[in-house]
Amino acid sequence: MRILSKRQVTELVLYSPQHIARLEKAGLFPKRVPLGPNRVGWLEIEILEWIEERLRRRDEP
């Protein structure tokens, strides 16, 4: 299991940190994992599944 940093997630999904926060608040993005008082991360598998879901939607008729 791998945890991605905010920078890694923004590079992977090509969204700004602010947009990711809005999606999280709306329940449309994987939840962050608190790592410390000022540090968060995301499970890589959840981010990859989120991307795959978008790809499946793209391919739907």
Show the residue positions of the predicted features.
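A short, Lys/Arg-enriched interface patch at domain edges and termini
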Residues: E46-P61
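Short, solvent-exposed alpha-helical "recognition" segments
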Residues: A26-V33
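Short Lys/Arg-enriched helix C-cap and helix-to-coil transition segments
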Residues: V33-R39
